[in-house]
């Protein structure tokens, strides 16, 4: 899989899905599929949850994606797509939920590949979602804050 091609809508992931395919997932598909989040929000370290082996394995690859405006715009679009899922489905606002790990990944990816501002905006939007009824544990809140 070539990350830059995938993130610019020119390639497919390791399962043959395009970014558009993933953006068209139903809420049920988002909840039940656990391998897409590492693909649409890549990091420079392997996932501790899903072991497909795909990550940004060189600083050159990180720079290449970071300097590709189309790729970074699509990462931002993916973050908006994911936050809309979180707005529609509030069960993740609990003591522990796997979507909280996904939130951490999104923040880390935005910080790595887009900007601190984009990461901070996503983080602040998450805090707004839980503002009136926060059930998320303090450890997770600290992960988000420090991501």
Kindly label every feature range from the protein language model.
Residues 85-147:
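Alpha-helical bundle/repeat cores within regulatory domains of eukaryotic proteins
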Residues 1-90, 110, 117, 125:
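N-terminal leader regions that mediate targeting or early regulatory function
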